[in-house]
């Protein structure tokens, strides 16, 4: 919520119709917006000398009737310090002092009510196996319980009357008129709610409560400036409206929903936090930036304590539905803030003060400030961990990008981190916290003791269903201080079906101990209680329940505690059952020296020849000699050739599966796989060459000379790569020192090491038991017997723990001197591996190396805890000049772009795969680079810049991500750098893979979602086709190629094209061909053609050009366009694809309506395609209903 209003309105009413109390002489007083269904004083007092903020929130929530699943939406606000308190903040109050705080909803999600169809629906995750309700309002109501809903309404009223939307911020007469009308409507809803709540006529309420008490303060002051006659006329008009209004069936709840929905529209700042920061920097480890290291001195990237007193340089916006965004504050705004005495803490408050003064001086509203152009950083699900050092905050993203912030004070930094952490727990993982400094005490206890949050019964049932004897302990959904032990029992129904019956046993807290109902023993912790119950039988009447294994919370699991935003996404898991990798021709590789042996492979250094563009200087460094003669015909890359021994042809499939896995992932700390080459009987995996080779070899060579700080940076990078794989539910399976390749040494001052995790080699399932034993201690114990069930991300956590020991011990892994039988015996007896001398590091490794897979921490947890493992003498190792200018991560330099291969061509441009390697040492990331063809004219170059300007403003899951630009001033060229999507376009992918109808319909739905977003930004694509839809994985597509995209002018319905050039006419609607007009509906026509392509699996013999040319006959140039236009106007359309269901072809034909206004919008198409997708999901092709 915006913070500025508390400073302005400390004497105002925290509850709409209750007076604010004076502070007590001693103790803590927490003011409320709503005192609960029974009423009472709008505050709660505490006399305890020491409490945590979480304890206070839980006590108040219980008092007013808020249920445990909604606890995490609330927090305490300190109006005097203008900060929110993190949940672990300890409130120590002397008896002779007093403290006043506010209990408020802090975590807010716009459109939770579902009243705005233009915004994503928000709802709690539904039970497993169910789909979300189509009623968005019903979805939203699941977010809040009745008490939270009442509290939000009262808090919203308080925000509104205290100018969360101010009249003085508006500039045009139209805006001011709209604001006044909406405010009077809000006042009416306010009075209507009072009438319905008290059961009295609306006119009676209006006599007791003036409408001026229900409108913003700025509006009230504006009314006071009018004459008495004008004020009387306004009052009479409002009363007449109240008298004539017939409420009908308008319920109290609907009034409240309408009030809050209108408040969202009128006040975009409602439910958001805009945090001023004194310093902001974006970092990318790929550029050689050092990691953020915890130490006793100033952090390397810490701008220093003096910056905390300066004015804000940036603002960070945090919203529940929009994630984290930022923008630079203009110097003029900073000067105004400094002169207003706000000390940079609250720029909006000072800005408001200046406007008020200006208004009093001239009697007119001041010009509204320019709305900031927010730069998107990430969603909460993309965050791996957050580091807090004094007043400096570092937010780390899944792709290794980092946002560094310096806030005005330590309290402001804690407030900000607790905000990000709270949203993360609400949207990504309810059983994980991002930063130790703001960790909720109850969650810390729950993680330590294996306690689930307040789960609803369907989620409990789903967790206990897999096997008999499972049980779990979770917090009650109705009582904040009660735990529930739930156990399941299968029973045989008369019809032969098995049913799962749950039995719940309450666990009460008594004097700091935990007692299971019906059992006289007490335990100091839930963990000890659970350990005592392991293997026991619980009797309840005639029933007997066996407790065999406790079901522990797992990373990122879905439950009613997770809030979904937008359409329910399909799991982003890669399809590993289908092989997908680049085929390398044997003529493109040259085998050089032998490097050693791997598991059933021989490893060679090699050269991979990649096709060049004919430019002899392309890809050449300034100080680099040509690799080979004839560089103008291409270039050669240094690679590693892993040759599978021909005698092991029986495991070639497992070898291919490894190549396929590594070809479908892209991360800066994963070694790149170029593809597979079949050379006679040999199968060769062609992988990236990394300069300094295996880490374990290098560590042993440098024994005793590698500082611990260096090793911890390497450990963080390895954990980052494994966290990326875990997030995709992928298993590496062979994490060890020899598979970590050292790309940069990072021993020089101001540099850091850089590693890449290599491919795992031959899959674990193809190895013999002897080969698996050889991999001890890196192989997880559960994997030793073999079998598909043993493969899980938990095995990578064990491998990481063993590798961490290997790194700490300078490349010497434990148990290497033992015989195979001794290694097996070690695992069978569940012995512990040796631990490092550092206690914190020993704790982390022991957690990774526990024999129970479900108890191993997630890689998010590992990354978070690694930041606390740094020794106190690291400041001198990674010192960075804070005054050095920050590099712009969106600016790419040509000399660092190394071409790998061409990816495809469009009408005017060419897309290639490059490795961006600014340090020239193998640490680059794979990017897709688009450049104009050399023969393009000025018009095309102008359109090219427009394409870049469009793409850099877009951010959507189903639109290709913009990374930056590469500009060459000498050649006057501009290249667009985008994310690399490994699987390529649908046009190339579908003919080579067997994709079912349901999956094709999912792709179509995602295309509609991306196009709906594009249209909402007032752009038309003009080139939507299967060739321009890219496949990230087998469940996710992204729209690319915006070369023909145009911005629709404000107030217009179409864009008229005037330039000549090649156009994809067979995808164009009649109005485009005939009148050169492109409506939003013209993209819908193109979508219909794209859907046709999908249903034909992009068969070239069934392509739109082929089919249309069959209908119109032989023609050239404009005659083709003319005949095509006549054909379409006669009602001729593309035929129904083979095995295309009737309703899908009917949908295509709706998109092909001749009249643009008759075509559906993409917003209309999304729910239709979702329904059709759900219908055919899981059905065999034979049951599809075709015409």
Curated annotation (Swiss-Prot):
Segments of this protein annotated with the region Disordered: 335-366, 610-629
Domain called SH2: residue spans: 450-529
Leading EC class: transferase
Modified-residue entries (Phosphotyrosine), positions: 292, 604, 1054-1055
PTM comment: Phosphorylated. Phosphorylation by JAK1 at Tyr-1054 and Tyr-1055 induces kinase activation.
UniProt xrefs under InterPro entries: Band_41_domain, FERM_2, FERM_domain, FERM_F1, FERM_F2, JAK, JAK1-3/TYK2_PHL_dom, Kinase-like_dom_sf
Compositional bias ranges of the Acidic residues kind: 614-626
EC annotation from Swiss-Prot or TrEMBL: 2.7.10.2
Reactions this protein catalyses: L-tyrosyl-[protein] + ATP = O-phospho-L-tyrosyl-[protein] + ADP + H(+)
Catalytic site positions: 1023 (proton acceptor)
Transferase keyword on record: yes
Inhibition and activation profile: The protein kinase 1 domain (also termed pseudokinase domain) mediates autoinhibition of the TYK2 kinase domain.
Consequence of changing residue 1176 to F: Does not affect phosphorylation state and enzymatic activity
Domain FERM: 26-431
Record PTM Phosphoserine, positions in chain: 499, 525, 884
Effect of residue 1055 to F: Reduces basal catalytic activity and abolishes IFN-dependent activation
Mutagenesis or variant effect for residue 1145 to F: Does not affect phosphorylation state and enzymatic activity
Tissue-specific expression: Observed in all cell lines analyzed. Expressed in a variety of lymphoid and non-lymphoid cell lines.
Biased composition (Polar residues): 339-349
GO process terms (BP): cell differentiation; cell population proliferation; cell surface receptor signaling pathway via JAK-STAT; cellular response to virus; cytokine-mediated signaling pathway; growth hormone receptor signaling pathway via JAK-STAT; immune response; interleukin-10-mediated signaling pathway
Alphabetical keyword list: ATP-binding, Kinase, Nucleotide-binding, Phosphoprotein, Repeat, SH2 domain, Transferase, Tyrosine-protein kinase
Highest taxon in the source lineage: Eukaryota
Family per similarity comment: Belongs to the protein kinase superfamily. Tyr protein kinase family. JAK subfamily.
Disease: Immunodeficiency 35: A primary immunodeficiency characterized by recurrent skin abscesses, pneumonia, and highly elevated serum IgE.
Oligomer status and interactors: Interacts (via FERM domain) with JAKMIP1. Interacts with PIK3R1; this interaction is important for cell migration. Interacts with MPL/TPOR. (Microbial infection) Interacts with Epstein-Barr virus protein LMP1; this interaction inhibits TYK2-mediated interferon signaling.
Protein name, UniProt field: Non-receptor tyrosine-protein kinase TYK2
């Amino acid at each position: 919520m915006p913070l500025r209003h508390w400073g302005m309105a400390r004497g105002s009413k925290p509850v709409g119709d209750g007076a604010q109390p004076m502070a007590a002489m001693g103790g803590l007083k927490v003011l409320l917006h709503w005192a609960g269904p029974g009423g009472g004083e709008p505050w709660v007092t505490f006399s305890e000398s020491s409490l945590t903020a979480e304890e206070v929130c839980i006590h108040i929530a219980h008092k007013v009737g808020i249920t445990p699943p909604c606890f995490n939406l609330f927090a305490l606000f300190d109006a005097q310090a203008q900060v929110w308190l993190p949940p672990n903040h300890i409130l120590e109050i002397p008896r002779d002092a007093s403290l006043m705080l506010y209990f408020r909803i802090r975590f807010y999600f716009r459109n939770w009510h579902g009243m705005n169809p233009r915004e994503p629906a928000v709802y709690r995750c539904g039970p497993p196996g169910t789909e979300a309700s189509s009623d968005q309002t019903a979805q939203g109501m699941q977010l809040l319980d009745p008490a939270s809903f009442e509290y939000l309404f009262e808090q919203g009223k308080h925000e509104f009357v205290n100018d969360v939307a101010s009249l003085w911020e508006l500039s045009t007469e139209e805006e001011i008129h709209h604001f006044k009308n909406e405010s009077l409507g809000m006042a009416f809803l306010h009075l209507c709610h009072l009438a319905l709540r008290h059961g009295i006529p609306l006119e009676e309420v209006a006599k007791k409560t003036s409408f001026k008490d229900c409108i913003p303060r700025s509006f009230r002051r504006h009314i006071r400036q009018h004459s008495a006659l004008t004020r009387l006329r306004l009052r009479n008009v409002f009363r007449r409206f109240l008298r004539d209004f017939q409420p009908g069936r308008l319920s109290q709840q609907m009034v409240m929903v309408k009030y809050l929905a209108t408040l969202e529209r009128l006040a975009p700042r409602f439910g958001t936090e805009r945090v001023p920061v004194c310093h902001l920097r974006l970092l990318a480890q790929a550029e050689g930036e050092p990691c953020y290291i915890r130490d006793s001195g100033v952090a390397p990237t810490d701008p220093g304590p003096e910056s905390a007193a300066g004015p804000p340089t940036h603002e960070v916006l945090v919203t529940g539905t929009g994630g984290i965004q930022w923008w630079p504050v203009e110097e003029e705004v900073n000067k105004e803030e400094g002169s207003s005495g706000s000390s940079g803490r609250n720029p909006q408050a000072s800005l408001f003060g200046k406007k008020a003064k200006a208004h009093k001086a001239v009697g007119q509203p001041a010009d509204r400030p320019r709305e900031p152009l927010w730069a998107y950083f990430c969603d909460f699900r993309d965050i791996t961990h957050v580091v807090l050092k004094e007043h400096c905050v570092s937010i780390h993203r899944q792709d290794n990008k980092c946002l560094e912030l310096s806030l005005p004070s330590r309290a402001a930094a804690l407030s900000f981190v607790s905000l990000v952490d709270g949203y993360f727990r609400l949207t990504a993982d309810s059983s994980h916290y991002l930063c130790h400094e703001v960790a909720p005490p109850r969650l810390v206890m729950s993680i330590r003791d294996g306690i689930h949050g307040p789960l609803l019964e369907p989620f409990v049932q789903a967790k206990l269903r897999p096997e008999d004897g499972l049980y779990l302990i979770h917090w009650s959904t109705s009582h904040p201080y009660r735990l529930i032990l739930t156990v399941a029992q299968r029973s045989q129904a008369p019809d032969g079906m098995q049913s799962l019956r749950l039995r719940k046993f309450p666990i009460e807290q008594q004097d700091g101990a935990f007692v299971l109902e019906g059992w006289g023993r007490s335990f100091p912790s839930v963990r000890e209680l659970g350990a005592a119950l392991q293997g026991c039988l619980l009797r309840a009447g005639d029933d007997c329940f066996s407790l065999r294994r406790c079901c522990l919370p797992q990373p990122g699991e879905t439950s009613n505690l997770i809030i979904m935003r937008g359409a329910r996404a399909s799991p982003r898991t890669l399809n590993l059952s289908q092989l997908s990798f680049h085929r390398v021709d044997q003529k493109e590789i040259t085998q050089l020296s032998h490097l050693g042996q791997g598991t059933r492979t021989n490893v060679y250094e090699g050269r991979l020849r990649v096709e060049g563009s004919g430019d002899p200087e392309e890809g050449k460094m300034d100080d680099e000699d040509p690799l080979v003669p004839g560089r103008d015909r291409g270039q050669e890359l240094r690679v590693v050739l892993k040759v599978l021994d021909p005698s092991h042809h029986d495991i070639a499939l497992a070898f291919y599966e490894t190549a396929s896995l590594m070809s479908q992932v892209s991360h800066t700390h994963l070694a790149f796989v170029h593809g597979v080459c079949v050379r006679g009987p040999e199968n060769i995996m062609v992988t990236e060459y990394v300069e300094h080779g295996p880490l374990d070899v290098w560590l042993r060579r440098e024994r005793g000379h590698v500082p611990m700080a260096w090793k911890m940076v390497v450990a963080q990078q390895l954990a980052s790569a494994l966290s990326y794989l875990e997030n995709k539910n992928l298993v590496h399976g062979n994490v060890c020192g020899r598979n970590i390749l050292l790309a940069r040494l990072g021993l020089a001052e101001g540099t850091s090491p850089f590693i890449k995790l290599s491919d795992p080699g031959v899959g674990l399932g193809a190895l013999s038991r002897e080969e698996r034993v050889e991999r001890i201690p890196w192989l997880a114990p559960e994997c030793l017997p073999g079998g598909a069930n043993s493969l899980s991300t938990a095995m990578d956590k064990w491998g990481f723990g063993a590798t961490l020991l290997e790194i700490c011990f300078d490349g010497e892994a434990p148990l290497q001197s033992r015989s195979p039988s001794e290694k097996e015996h070690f695992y069978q007896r569940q012995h512990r591996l040796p631990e490092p001398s550092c206690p914190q590091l020993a704790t982390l490794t022991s957690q990774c190396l526990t024999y129970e897979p479900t108890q191993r921490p997630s890689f998010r947890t590992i990354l978070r805890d690694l930041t606390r493992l740094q020794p106190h003498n690291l400041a001198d190792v990674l010192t960075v000049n804070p005054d050095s200018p920050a590099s712009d991560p969106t600016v790419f330099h040509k000399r660092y772009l190394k071409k790998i291969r061409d990816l495809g061509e469009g009408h005017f441009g060419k897309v290639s795969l490059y490795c961006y390697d600014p340090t020239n040492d193998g640490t680059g990331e794979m990017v897709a680079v688009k450049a104009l063809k050399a023969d393009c004219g000025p018009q095309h170059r102008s359109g090219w810049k427009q394409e870049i300007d469009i793409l850099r403003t877009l951010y959507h899951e189903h639109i290709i991500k913009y990374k930056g630009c590469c500009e060459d001033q000498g050649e006057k060229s501009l290249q667009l750098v985008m994310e690399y999507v490994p699987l390529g376009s649908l046009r190339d992918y579908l003919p080579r893979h067997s994709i079912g109808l349901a999956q094709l319909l999912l792709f179509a739905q995602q295309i509609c979602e991306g196009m709906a977003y594009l249209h909402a930004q007032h752009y038309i694509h003009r080139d939507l086709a299967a060739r321009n839809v890219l496949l990230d994985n087998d469940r996710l597509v992204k729209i690319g190629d915006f070369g023909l995209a145009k911005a629709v002018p404000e107030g217009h319905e179409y864009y008229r094209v005037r330039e000549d050039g090649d156009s994809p006419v067979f995808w164009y609607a009649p109005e485009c061909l005939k009148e050169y007009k492109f409506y939003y509906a013209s993209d819908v026509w193109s979508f219909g053609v794209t859907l046709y392509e999908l249903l034909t699996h992009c068969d070239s013999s069934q392509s739109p050009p082929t089919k249309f040319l069959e209908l119109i006959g032989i023609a050239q140039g404009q005659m083709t366009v003319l005949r095509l236009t006549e054909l379409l106007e006669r009602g001729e359309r593309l035929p129904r694809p083979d095995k295309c269901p009737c309703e899908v072809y009917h949908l295509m034909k709706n998109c092909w309506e001749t009249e643009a206004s008759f075509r559906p919008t993409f917003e209309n198409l999304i729910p239709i395609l979702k329904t059709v997708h759900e219908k055919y999901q899981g059905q065999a092709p034979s049951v599809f209903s075709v015409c």
